[in-house]
């Protein structure tokens, strides 16, 4: 077996990591930064430590704070225009998956013809573009350290998944001190996204020993610490442990790939502007139960990682307990239990089927699915 591991050149972790990053970048003399973020994060004061550190080092920057959830190609073009107008030299993304994915797409345009969605698929970005620093505020998408970006093509109403090592940030930052004020609902959704990353990577056809180790530890940490991070958001230990867990999950899926959960979740996210983590969380137990017959022994290990006492159980019984444990965690952190609660109807499903099957995440799923089977999975998730 041969496989590739692609990671950021530098990763910084722990409270105070933002200040450490600024000192590091100051020595590189990259020039002027475009800070790509969400205006709400600016209003909450979450970027104050970054601004202060940059000002202290007398480092030039321009703020672009127009990012919204589920970013579109139009937003990417707007951000790239801001980058050009301010004569910037590199990018700093601050936020969760949406700001970081937007910055990754802008990075593409700094060295390749647009639009960024033209690079949907695997390995199509020819030139790396300018340096990118990614400061993560959620736990999480792991966008700060992965090769993935997801941008909506508004005309086609589809999430275009761009996967290329050239998108991996040069520096990844996970500073739990800026995660303390993330609302419970966002904490829950992003945490379940991270769990989805870990489980899909572990049962992926691309899994290997290095991704297995990262995925199992990620599952253990997320199952243990997500409820506390949701219920007691200012608990720094819970936030740090979730940051570690989601990063390990990112290390796993960045090499092993994902699966049908993400392939199906991308579609309601695109057409109904639903939170990505919520879509994943709703689909996760349903699709993994569909996958279970093809990976019984692996799901038994997922159950162990989620704290199930599997002693004396057959792998078959333990694998079913893994699905139950996923459902239990999802309910505990307040995830809606079906898409119908979010305005989705049966009529919406037909338009998603072909797009889900064509999604770049689908090929790594341990069990192939037909169009009819995808329809049934969506119906079960209503």
Residues covered by each model-derived region:
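A glycine/threonine-rich phosphate-anchoring loop and its flanking beta-alpha core
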Residues: 111-207, 298-305
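N-terminal small/polar loop signature for handling phosphorylated ligands or for N-terminal nucleophile
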Residues: 42-115, 123, 228-239
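An N-terminal, well-structured beta->alpha segment
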Residues: 1-64, 381
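C-terminal and late-domain segments of enzyme folds
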Residues: 184-248, 252
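Glycine-rich phosphate/pyrophosphate-binding beta-alpha loops
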Residues: 140, 247-280, 359-363
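Gly/Pro-rich interdomain helix-loop hinge
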Residues: 271-348
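Short, amphipathic C-terminal "tail helix"
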Residues: 345-382
